[in-house]
Amino acid sequence: MDYGAILGKGAEADIYSFTAFGTEMVVKVRNPKAYRIAQIDNSIRRARTKKEARIMAHAAGIGVRVPRVFALGTFSIYMEMVKGKNANLLEEKELASRRVLGSAGEMLGMMHSSGIVHGDITPANIMVSGNGIYIIDFGLAEMSRSVEDMGVDLLLMERSVSKNGFGLFLEGYKGRNASSGNVLKRLEEIKRRGRYQNRSLD
């Protein structure tokens, strides 16, 4: 099927622009893996596509801004095209602000409070539009109450932004997640384990 112009290629999926009934959309298509048996590969891709759309709908239902899902194919998700700028392209002054990282922290706090772990929460998966920020790419997201998984989400963001930016992110996060103290404790444990492992490899 011709999905239109390609916007990006990833390890798991490709992203295309698509227009239907006068509406601009983004189509995320999960690619087959040649190393897997076709029947197994189809089953995995079908399940992951459904799960991603389901988690996006759950996030939207609790007030997190995510691209609206218009339709679901066997291996594809047709969703709203968010007009704006990827946060990964912003200058530090604009990125490290309450409007961007502060709001992103609030949204992740809401997600964690509702049992959603993003799995790849970095500025590259934040879109900044005229009416606020959007969290995108739920391809690695899980429904999980694991404090470890939530701590890893925070670690990913901490490693991706400045100290000041992460501080603003945490302000927003703590304001929306009543269990943030437990997650922050686990974050410190994860970091200590990482330092120990690094020393062991030296």
What is the predicted role of each segment?
Residues 3-50:
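ATP-binding glycine-rich loop module of kinase domains
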Residues 21, 72-74, 129-130:
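Structural motif
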Residues 28, 52, 120, 137, ...:
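Acidic active-site catalytic centers that drive phospho-/nucleotidyl reactions
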Residues 31, 45-49, 53, 60, ...:
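Conserved structural core of kinase catalytic domains
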Residues 33-40, 85-88, 137-139, 154:
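Short glycine/proline- and charge-enriched loop/turn segments
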Residues 58-64, 88-124, 129, 133, ...:
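Conserved kinase catalytic-core helix
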Residues 134-202:
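C-lobe/activation-segment region of protein kinase-like
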